[in-house]
Structure formats: C-alpha cells, structure tokens
Curated annotation (Swiss-Prot):
Comp. bias (Low complexity): 412-443
Stretch list, region Disordered: 167-188, 412-457
GO terms of biological process kind: autophagy; protein transport
Entry keyword set: Autophagy, Coiled coil, Cytoplasm, Membrane, Protein transport, Transport
UniProt biased composition (Acidic residues): 167-179
Major localization class: cytoplasm
Coiled-coil spans in chain: 287-397
Superkingdom per UniProt: Eukaryota
Statement: the UniProt record of this protein carries the keyword Coiled coil: yes
The name this protein goes by in its record: Autophagy-related protein 23
Membrane topology category: Peripheral membrane protein
Amino acid sequence: MKNQINKLDDILLQQQHTNDYLLELVKFHNNLLHDNLTSIENLNLTRKKILDCFNDLFNLNSIIINYHGDIKLEIKNLKEIIIKFNKLNKLEIFYQNKLNQWKSSKVKQIQSASSTNNKITINCNYQPLLKTYLNQIDPDESTLSNQFNSNLSINDEKLIYTNESFTEDEDDTGDEDNDIDHSNNHTNNDEDPFLILSNIKLLENCQSTIKADINQLEFLLSNYKKDLKFIENELNSQNLKTKYNITLMQEKLDKINIKRKKLLIKIGLSKNKNLTSVLDKDEKIIIENINDFINSKINSLNDQLSNKKENSIVLNQKINLWEQVINQLNDLENSLKIYLSKNKKKKSIDYNIMIEWINDTINNLNDIIDSTDIQLLRNLIENEKKVLVQATNELKLNLTPVNSKINDSISKSINNNNNTNITTNTSINNNNNTNENSLLDSSQFQSSKNPFPNIGTSPPKISISEHIASNNSFTTFQLNNTSNDKLMKNE
C-alpha cells in the first residue's frame, strides 16, 4: 500500500510538471505566432507538443483514476492517523501534568502542631527524697566535698587502728575502766546512728526511684531512636518513589514523541528516520499543526476522487478539439501548397480562392471556439485565428498576378517544406492504455527559460515590399505567420 501511494505521489508530481510545461508551451506558441522570423517547423512542433501534453495529462489522469481504491484507503488511514495524534496529544497533556506534579515545588512545609497529646511527662520521684536527704546532712560531710573524702579516709584508718588495738589488747587483763574509756573514745562523736540509718533508707529509696526513672527515659529514648530509623527509611523510600515516577513519566513522554515521529514518517511529513525522543524544530511545528496538514492532504485526495473523472472528459475534449484545429490548419496549408504547386507555371494566382479557403478555416475555428468553454483552449485557437484574419486582410490588398520569378520561389519553397522532417519528443500515445510506462519522458520538461531556440518579439508583418509592389507582384503570406524569407527560398 505504501509503495502504491508513493507511486501515486510520483504520478501527481509528474502531472504537475506536465501542467507547468503546457503553460510554458502556450506562452511560447503565442510568441511564435507574433514573430516573423519563426520557422514553420518550430510552429508545427509547438502545436504538436501542446497536443502531446494534452495526451499525457489525459493518460496520467486515467492512471490516477485506477488508484481510486488506494486513494480511499489512504484517506481512511489519514483519518485514523489524526485520531492517533489526538490520542497522543491527550496522553502527552496527562503525563506532562503528572510529571509537573512530581516535580512540583509548591508543596507546603507541614508544621508540627503543639498539643497536650504530643507532650511526654517525665517522672522525677527521686528528687523530693534527695532534697530531704540533703537537708538532713552537712554538705561538707557529703561526697560533694573533698574534705569529706579526706576525713573519711582518716576516720577509716582510725577505725581500723582501733580495731587492731582492740584485738591486740583483747587478752590483756587491764582495768575495766580503761576499757570503758577506750570504748567511749571510739563512739563518742556528733553523728547520730539513727539519723545515719534513716538516711541510708532514704538513699536506698532514692536510688531505686531514680533507677526506675532512668529505665523510663531509656525506654523513651529507645522508642525515639526506632522512630528516627523508621523516618529515615520512609524518607529514602519516598524519594526513590518520586524519582521512579519522574523517570516513568518522562519515559512515557519520550515514547509518545517516538510514536509521533513514526506517524510523521508514515505520511511523508518527516524525512528524519532517526527515531529519537527529541523532536527538531520543523517536527514540532508540524505536530502543533498536524490536523491542518493531514486535513489538507485528505482534501487534496478527495479532490482527486471527485475531479478526475470530470477531468478525463475535459482533457479528452482538449485533445479532440486541438486535433481538429491542427487538422484544419494542416488542411489549409496543404490546399495552398497544392494550389500553388499546380499553378507554379502560370503567370497569375487567384487570391480570392486563397482568401476563401482561409475564411473557411477561420469559420471552422470559430465553430470550435464556440463548442468549448475551456479558456486555455479558446485562447490557443483565438491566437491562431487572429493570424489567419490578418493574413486575409493583407491578401485582399494584393489581388495582382504574381510574376514568374516569385512564383518559382513559392514552388521551390513548397517543395522544400514537403521534404522537411519535423522531429518531436516522444510522448504518451493517445489510447486508453493507462500503463505507468506511458509517463512523459523527462526530456520533455525543458527549461522554461529556453524550451526552444530564442524567438523575437516583433509584431506580425504580412505586407508588400517596395520592390515587389513596383513590379506589380503579389506579396506571399506565410501561413501561420512565418516570414516570407523562411517560406520562400530562392535558389
């Protein structure tokens, strides 16, 4: 199917070239008719080329008609491609919005709300006990004081010494009073045993209480650390999820661009076959206006469907009518050649007969003009008719016998023209065969600047020279507006 459409595109391009070439020929034909230096060969060749173009356009049009099924299928495919582009556009908008959401910087920072439910009460039950203890002792004798530590060491030594002494003297039979005095010296101080024992109980209670508080704090700290670990793991997970979704959305957008490129290549709107996700400037412009581009192509194909059969009728009419024109002109030319050839030995020629034949041809051309409304064809025939009308007007001014010298030159010119071979470019044969091999040869599309040898632009001149008029001779006219020098060559 794709190859068929490509061939159709080539045929449409060939058709356009042929139309352009035809317009060049029409202008060139008109210039030839108004140039006295133009040869009859070039003029006939131009008429033939115009007919060839009509034939070529008819055959090209017939080939296009044979592609109607492919054209309809192509129109269907183009409509489906429009639907695909519209879907891709919607997907692009969707995924682009998603991508923007994932990249959004508009997310507000959530502040922690102050609430009684968020407060934790820490028990400090040991502090009242500790304060009670501190109130009952002398701070200088506590472990907070360095002096206490020093005294404590001395007292310990004394205590140890006393005990040792007591042990050594334990078997001595000393005076009991001495024992009593010694005992009194060891225990006689300012400290109250009851108070110390009470403080011990107080400190033990304080110790157990603060340990309980520490256990509570350690449990709370452990929970805090667990929460911190969870938060860090969740933060990492959410960041990965964000990166994943951003990458995913970007991949979706890249795939959309690749699909768009494939569609552009399929319908011939992109020559870049590198299927990357990056669109160049031209591709972006085409995609932005893709509906207009495709609808324009669909409309063009619909025109091909609706107009080609009508075009065949018009083109066939052009061929037939232009052939009639060429035949009319050839018949007139041949009649005049035969007439002049038969009367080449006579001393006079009846111009009335020649004028009558030309007028008959003019009338026939008028009938052809009236039978068509094709402006291009009407212009071509009108240009030919104007030359014939001017020829009759000038012949009416020259109703005198021709001398033998001029007559001989006319005859020789006729013989030379009969022996002239006119070559033309090969073109499509005018038949109903629509084989693609019948396309125009590329040589037929010559440059518009120089399709034929350069021509002049002087107005048509059919007149009597001073020399011929003085000798009562007639001025020969060149049918189809060729110059006398070209038509009549003296040996």
